[in-house]
Design a protein with these regions (language model features):
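Long, contiguous binding/interaction regions
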Residues: 2-5, 9-91, 101-129
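Non-membrane alpha-helical segments in proteins
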Residues: 94-95
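Basic nucleic-acid-binding interfaces
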Residues: 98
């Protein structure tokens, strides 16, 4: 299934250059308060796997969309996926750093992170991949 961005029919993720996002989870223990879609993992490898799955597949988006009052009104562009996305995680003292490489636009990445981590994450830097 090809992924299209809202307002840009025919533009799939493979047509957009990949970006490297440097992310930080300062207090992984506080993520349980992020809600129904929060990270289940507490460690860097597990969080990296969950975020990678959220970028590669639309399962998290579909669960969130189904929970909305009017699922049909949700912009389908928010469900964009990048099958080539990669995420790696590292523990540094008490915080977890994640590096995501994806073609998904930053606004969609931020939406997925808000679902997984609420306000408990920080975007530290961005660079071309």
């Amino acid at each position: 299934m090809a992924t299209h961005y809202a307002g840009m029919p025919g533009i799939g993720v493979d047509a957009i250059m990949a970006t490297r996002f440097y992310l930080s989870i300062p207090d992984p223990g506080a993520l349980s308060a992020a809600g129904a879609f929060a990270f289940r993992s507490q460690g860097p490898e597990g969080m990296a796997e969950e975020l990678q799955a959220a970028l590669r597949e639309d399962a998290l988006f579909q669960r969130w969309r189904a929970a909305q009052d009017d699922p049909d009104a949700v912009d389908p562009g928010l469900g964009a996926t990048d099958p080539a996305a990669t995420v790696r995680g590292e523990q540094h003292d008490l915080k977890i750093d994640l590096i995501a490489i994806t073609s998904i636009p930053g606004t969609i990445l931020k939406h997925r992170l808000r679902l997984l981590a609420g306000n408990g994450w920080e975007l530290r830097d961005v660079s071309a991949a």
